[in-house]
Amino acid sequence: MQAKNMKKGKSGALGKRDWVIAARKLLVRRGIAGVRVEPLAKAMGVTTGSFYWHFSGRQELYDALLQDWHDTNTAPLYEAVKAAGSDPRRQYLAFFGVWVLERNFDPGYDQAIRDWARISKKVADDLREIDGRRIQLLTRVFENFGYSGLPAEMRARVTYYHQVGYYAMHVKEPRERRLELAPYYAEILTGHPWMHALHSVDGIRAGMLGDVSFEDNWTGLEEVTSARPFSESVRSGSRPT
């Protein structure tokens, strides 16, 4: 018996991808302990024999699930930043557009992987690598803003840890409110009030979707990076202009 609620391939049979999608839903809803062959088969309306046609066992499904997470929750961040071009403001907006607008990104999936990592060294190692890659991507964005070395990396870490904490704490905040606050976060994180120039929630949303152009080339941090170290600026109470 074929599943009534799953999209079938051209042949009418459920494929390997269908199993991974079903496993993803179970992982988010019940945790890794709930991702078992019998519940999956029942949810899909097929026998367990269908599972073993595509997978040698649960570990192969788990490996496919991790790869799916890479593809759906990390690759879009790289693609968005690459498509944004060289302007760091557009890169920043693109990165946060994936997060805030949840474009090809499922925060529940990320959190489920983090929960899984608590009991699996393999998943923990994989998660650590992906977290590192995402932070490296953000570091490059901050380098394009004009920071270098540790200042760029620390801003990237604070930005990333802030967002991960937002999800981990299950903060309930309307998307419109998040967009409204975005310029204030951006000013703190990038050291410059550039996003306020987008004027409205609609303007910020459009910017996150790539529909924005800046009349000037980015030079906002030249005074900061060419003058004294960031730590000295903090001690003196100065800020970028």
Annotate each predicted stretch with a short phrase.
Residues M1-L14, H196-T241:
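N-terminal intrinsically disordered/low-complexity leader segments
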Residues D18, K25-A64:
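Helix-turn-helix
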Residues F55, L101, I113-I119:
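Short helix-capping/turn signature of helix-turn-helix
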Residues Q67-T74:
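Short, basic, alpha-helical segments at the C-terminal edge of helix-turn-helix-like DNA-binding modules
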Residues Y78-Y109, T159:
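Hydrophobic alpha-helical connector segments
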Residues D106-Q111, K121-G146, P151-V158:
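Amphipathic alpha-helical packing segments from all-alpha helical-bundle domains
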Residues F145-G207:
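Hydrophobic/aromatic-rich alpha-helical bundle segments in the mid-to-C-terminal region
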